[in-house]
Amino acid sequence: MAQSDAASGLRAGFRGLTTRGRSFLAAGITAVVCAYLLDQDALLRVGVLLSALPLVAVVVVANTRYRVASGRRLSPRRAIAGQEARVHLRLDNVSRVPTGLLLLEDKVPYVLGPRPRFVLDRVEPRGYREVSYRVRSDLRGRYPLGPLQLRLADPFGMCEVTRAFTASDVLTVVPLVQALPYVRLSGEWLGQGESHSRTLALAGNDDVILREYRPGDDLRRVHWRSTAKYGELMVRREEQPQKARATVLLDTREIGHRGSGPASSFEWAVSCVASVATHLLERGYQTQLLTDTGLAVPGPGAGGHNNAADTSGLILDALAVADLSDGGTLSRAEEPLRTGGEGLLVAILGELDDTQTARLGRLRSRTGGAIAFLLDTGTWAGLRMLAPGTGGDEFRARVRKLREAGWTVIPVRAGDSVPDLWRAAEGAKTTAPNREEAGA
């Protein structure tokens, strides 16, 4: 086994000969051949010396057995798209002998920048060295960092051997989160430590909270007045929830968005969802992310036990890898909203057809309050500039139908600011129609 390892090390050493080492070896062999043909002893000595240098370097580097350990630390572990993060590397010499020249190279995806390289001249026994580099990505996602590669080289630069560690890390680049102003929203009610006036969309004169009947509910809790009004069994919730609930719906349908890259309508929607969810968590809401694919974060088993920081991290991690779906409807998101959507619903929606608009209108009765950021995706595709009359009437019709169903609708166009639109949500029912007419 030892002989096999030695032979393997020598083969790796010969493969690691640098251009300088190969040149010296070729020149030395040539000089030896010429010295033999010309019977020149001096030239023979030069040839032997030139050949011996790279061969000795191969033997030395191949038999070098430094005991080193590496570590990596990310600051922060969740970076915001467009902002820098710093990666700290630490190399420990755990042996009793000093190291020679070490070349470090960390493996990073091209989207984060060029591969960082460092040269460490000497690390004393039981010593360590720390280096750091910066990474930056305009695209959200999860990017692997590592493994760290260690190159051993001789002092003359004749031979280099690469050895890789096995550990790697993941840098999560989350969408941009913008600070939103505090506004009073429809559907607010008594939250944790805050006095909210809740709009009971499903209640009658009694101060009760209602929801759809579920199998196993006590029939004595049926609220007959609301049952007659909505045409299906509605039951009272006897307990007052301790924490306000909110659901943020992200429309990921590819057919509902326009544009590509960071300037697309989908990326605007993802950033808007991140900002809204973070804002609601800061205000004490028990917040859940929901997509048209049925993805729910936190999942049904969470039970609301996560604190705001943990929930925010889960949602941002999910948004970091959110992608367009090939679905054509929002139907997979409707069932969770029907069964557990008594709180505030904030939906960031792409382009809708008549069927989707009607179904969203009917879904409004299941929520305590509903706000829709409806994206005019034609402005992302440049259609409004090329043909000003294209699609404008259809978009305004969708806005009108959702409002008639009880939604608070915020029309969104390319370039709009999320904080400004959020501020407009407080008085959207009276101000938004004027904005539409002005932008028509």
Please give the residue ranges for each predicted region:
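Exposed, interaction-prone extracellular/peripheral surfaces
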Residues: M1-R15, T19, T166, L176, ...
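Extracellular/lumenal glycan-associated context and N-glycosylation machinery
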Residues: M1-G71
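An amphipathic, basic-hydrophobic helix/alpha-beta surface used to engage anionic
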Residues: A42-L44, A52-A302, L344-I348, R362
